[in-house]
Regions:
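C-terminal catalytic/motor cores of large multi-domain enzyme assemblies
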Residues: 1-112
């Protein structure tokens, strides 16, 4: 995970400086579109060809939720997944979102 974090920082820095190499930005199969930092709660993205899917990430919003039969204020975030059904069926996309939800809610599981 540490190496992934270092790679992400490196790519982000070079992307902002417009110094990524062509081979580093082509050949993707999945796109993540994040408008959450602009306060957008949810949105639907259009799949970039030749990708198989795109995930839209909304802003983190505090809302009342029920935890252990009690109403508490908790951070929530909406994710939307659009899949090209020629390559990914809805059930597989749903399983992906459920797994991602579990990791976001329980990040310690990433280390197990």
């Amino acid at each position: 995970l540490n190496q992934i974090g270092l790679n992400v920082k490196d790519f982000a820095s070079r992307a902002q400086e417009k110094k990524l190499l062509q081979n580093e930005i082509e050949g993707s199969t999945f796109t993540i579109s994040n408008l959450g930092m602009f306060g957008i709660e949810s949105f639907t993205s259009i799949i970039n060809q030749p990708n198989s899917a795109i995930m839209s990430v909304g802003s983190i919003i505090q809302k009342p939720v029920i935890i252990n039969d009690k109403i508490v204020i908790s951070n929530t975030m909406k994710l939307t997944l659009a899949c090209d059904h020629r390559t990914i069926d809805g059930a597989s996309g749903s399983k992906f979102l459920l797994t991602l939800k579990d990791f976001v809610e329980n990040p310690i599981k990433l280390l197990l």
